[in-house]
């Protein structure tokens, strides 16, 4: 049940104030649980603070002094069922160590899904040894090793950063449409693999923002055997007073949309997104590499927003 995966039951909530992340992280399974819950919490934060679902589609949880809203299965709100199914599909790919990046994309024209208005990137790495991941100390990344308390603090900081940004963004268009693209590590992912709720995607070589895009790094968390990095790209005009609270990328926004086998140089292997320009991946780059496997939801989601 997705409800159990995303938010547990109400009795657990009463038993502890810190119900989201496990109290100890000592092995690969517990590390996976942390990353799953962090991913689900971030998606819940985004959908709640961007006003995509009603209050009734969320459950209350606490993480230290943070009051969080966690998306739940709400039969009265079919959209919540769509998103939870997407999250479950990501969980399946994470368990198998196939998932490289999940990209939650918001656009307005169903005939032009490449013309985006907001993007949320979740990039995943794996290690068998459980060693500490290295993150850029000059950015708003949060280092964490295998110490359980450090991991919880890192998760809390990342979620807090995301909350700060969401609360300082201007509103989305009323007719926004949601989809999620999943990118894989080609070397280990079977050619015919598709997570539940997903199908093979048509590979797009470009994305387009109608306005000027700005890319913001929310941070990174390592849980020992897994790590997750979060980046948000939105229109610059949508930024209110949170510009100095998060780390911005200078110049042209780069989205890792193709060529996702480049583990260490994320920005170098993405397709650029520029103001009113379709920027294609260089043919010489793509022709020298195996075609990238990408999945998309069987059904996209159109929120009933007014």
UniProtKB/Swiss-Prot annotation:
Residues 29-232 form the HORMA domain. InterPro entries: HORMA_dom, HORMA_dom_sf, HORMA_MeioticProgression. One of its GO terms (cellular component) is chromosome. Disruption phenotype: Male mice are infertile due to spermatocyte loss as a result of characteristic impairment of sex body formation. Spermatocyte apoptosis is confined to the stage IV seminiferous tubules. In contrast to males, female mice are fertile. One of its GO terms (biological process) is meiotic sister chromatid cohesion. Specifically expressed in meiotic germ cells. Keywords: Chromosome, Meiosis, Nucleus, Phosphoprotein. Essential for synapsis surveillance during meiotic prophase via the recruitment of ATR activity. Plays a key role in the male mid-pachytene checkpoint and the female meiotic prophase checkpoint: required for efficient build-up of ATR activity on unsynapsed chromosome regions, a process believed to form the basis of meiotic silencing of unsynapsed chromatin (MSUC) and meiotic prophase quality control in both sexes. Required for the DNA double-strand break-independent, BRCA1-dependent activation of ATR on the sex chromosomes that is essential for normal sex body formation. This is HORMA domain-containing protein 2. The gene is Hormad2.
């Amino acid at each position: 049940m997705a409800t159990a995966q995303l938010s547990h039951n109400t009795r657990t909530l009463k038993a502890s104030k810190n119900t989201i992340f496990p109290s100890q992280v000592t092995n690969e399974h517990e590390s996976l649980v942390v990353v799953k819950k962090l991913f689900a919490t971030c998606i819940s934060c985004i959908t709640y603070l961007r006003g995509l679902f009603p209050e009734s589609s969320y459950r209350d949880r606490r993480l230290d002094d943070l009051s969080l809203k966690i998306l739940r299965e709400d039969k009265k709100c079919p959209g919540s069922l769509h998103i939870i199914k997407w999250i479950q599909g990501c969980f399946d790919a994470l368990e198998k160590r196939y998932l490289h990046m999940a990209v939650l994309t918001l656009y307005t024209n169903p005939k032009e899904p490449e013309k985006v208005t907001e993007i949320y990137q979740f990039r995943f790495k794996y290690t068998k040894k459980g060693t500490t991941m290295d993150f850029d100390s000059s950015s708003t990344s949060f280092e964490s090793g295998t110490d359980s308390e450090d991991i919880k603090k890192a998760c809390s900081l990342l979620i807090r950063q995301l909350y700060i940004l969401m609360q300082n963004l201007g509103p989305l268009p009323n007719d926004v449409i949601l989809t999620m693209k999943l990118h894989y590590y080609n070397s280990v992912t079977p050619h015919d693999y598709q997570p539940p709720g997903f199908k093979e995607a048509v590979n797009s070589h470009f994305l387009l923002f109608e306005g000027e895009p700005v890319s913001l790094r929310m941070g990174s968390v390592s849980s020992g055997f897994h790590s997750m990095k979060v980046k948000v790209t939105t229109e610059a005009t949508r930024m209110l007073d949170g510009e100095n609270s998060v780390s911005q990328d200078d110049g042209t926004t780069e989205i890792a949309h193709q060529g996702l086998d480049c583990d260490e140089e994320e920005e170098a292997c993405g397709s650029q997104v520029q103001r009113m320009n379709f920027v294609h991946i260089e043919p010489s780059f793509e022709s020298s590499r195996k075609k990238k496997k990408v999945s998309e939801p069987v059904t996209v989601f159109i929120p009933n927003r007014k």
